Amino acid sequence: MTVTAAASPAPARFSWASLSRYGEAPVRAFVEIGQMVWFALTAVGQIPFAMRRYHKEMLRMVAQMGMGTGAMAVVGGTAAIVGFITLSAGSLVAIQGYATLGNIGVEAFTGFLAALVNVRFVAPVAAGQALAATVGAGATAELGAMRISEEIDALEVMSIRSVAFLASTRVVAGLVVIIPLYGLAITLAFLSQQVTTVFFYGQSAGTYNHYFHTFLRLNDVGWSFAEVILVAVVVMTTHCYYGYTASGGPVGVGEAVGRSMRLSLITIVVVVVLTAMAVYGKSPNFNLTV
């Protein structure tokens, strides 16, 4: 009886194709970043042309973004969504701030947190996320549907500048809508934090108002509006880019919405943090005194 040894498996062969495939991934990422930046610059650069030629479309987009359509209009549109998000964010700042400051016996400074944290970080991030989740995602889906149904190609055939007509108008509409929305958002954030601190935790209204008005500065509010305007530009250009370049049918449109939302949520925080560091990094612009 003879026993034959099992044949050893052939050694894995090095594949240059797989190496080149992995090496192309960073290149594709850099190419997409370049295309996105160029699209954003083109959309922003064609704003004056869009305001002259497509002002009716711009007004329609302002109305649609402000109050929404269909079921969203029933609950108050984007304004209601922004209000609910900022109310929750302001209440969380009050709850966490009062509990944390209470551990070291300075819960009276909760009004200081409302004047500082809400204006510089919480309200811009919450408003940007609400804008991305409502207006931005809708813009991506709408432009993506137009791309796969060849409506954007039809605009180009009719000698209509598709980027100006579709993207620039939405960027301007987002800027117009975000200013009153952010005014509402920051007001509700202040109100929710005061109600939570005074009525639920029982802090004196005079103590809260003293520290709130002491540390609330008008230039901080102005910089906060500048932050949220920059956030709106980034959010709208990002979502318009993914919708404009969508491909692959309805599945591709859904994937474009998901990618745009993920990138928007990241860029919102990055923009707010970098802006806050640029404005307050060298001088915090407040003196903490009891």
What are these regions (language model features)?
Residues G70, V74, V122, A126, ...:
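Selective transmembrane-helix segments that form parts of the transport pathway or gating/packing helices
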Residues S8-R60, Y242-S247:
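Short, membrane-interfacial amphipathic segments enriched in basic
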Residues V106-D153:
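Hydrophobic alpha-helical transmembrane segments of multi-pass membrane transport proteins
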Residues F49-L59, A63-T78, L265:
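Membrane-interface helix starts
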Residues G243, I266, V270-N287:
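Membrane-helix cytosolic exit motif
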Residues L143-S168, G249-V253:
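Short cytoplasmic-facing helical segments at TM-TM junctions of multi-pass membrane proteins
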